[in-house]
């Protein structure tokens, strides 16, 4: 497991993610804690979030509409996973897109495939499970002030327009 300073150094070496248009690199359906599927395509709806995802089944956040779908930047997931499977953070979409506060603020709408998602006010932060999987250094890195501003842990979204999303689809800012 990497330390906070190692993660920061490695992150600084990575090319910046695009601000306006990127791609969907991975789809993750959370079946149960620690159990994930990684389909090549998925339906996204207002009623269920990602089809089959435990959000739609009323898990721990009790179907909080502001947490329907979670996104994380792929390069950050690669760093914290450190060779482990990239689905382990449990975010629904891993994207090559800058999710920082300065790039995509609350209310920003993103088109991923045919679906449109809106970034919500709910912060997406690391927790005990995140620390157990990736170490205290990773948790500190994503949750410190700078990590929160860069949204290293990702963002929570609600579904505005339902539709299909596929791995390789564009993810782009529709409105800021």
Describe the residue ranges of each PLM region.
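Metal-cofactor-dependent catalytic cores
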Residues: 1-176
């Amino acid at each position: 497991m990497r330390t906070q300073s190692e993660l920061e150094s490695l992150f600084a070496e990575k090319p910046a993610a695009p601000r306006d248009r990127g791609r969907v690199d991975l789809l993750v359906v959370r079946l149960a804690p620690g159990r994930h599927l990684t389909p090549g395509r998925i339906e996204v709806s207002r009623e269920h979030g990602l089809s089959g995802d435990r959000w739609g089944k009323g898990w721990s956040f009790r179907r909080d509409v502001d947490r329907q779908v979670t996104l994380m930047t792929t390069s950050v997931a690669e760093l914290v996973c450190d060779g482990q499977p990239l689905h382990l953070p449990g975010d629904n979409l891993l994207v090559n897109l800058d999710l920082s506060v300065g790039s995509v603020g609350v209310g920003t709408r993103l088109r991923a495939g045919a679906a449109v998602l809106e970034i919500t006010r709910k912060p997406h932060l690391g927790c005990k499970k995140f620390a157990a999987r990736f170490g205290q250094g990773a948790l500190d890195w994503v949750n410190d002030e700078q990590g929160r501003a860069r949204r290293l842990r990702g963002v929570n979204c609600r579904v505005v327009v339902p539709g299909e999303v596929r791995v390789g689809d564009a993810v782009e800012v529709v409105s800021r």
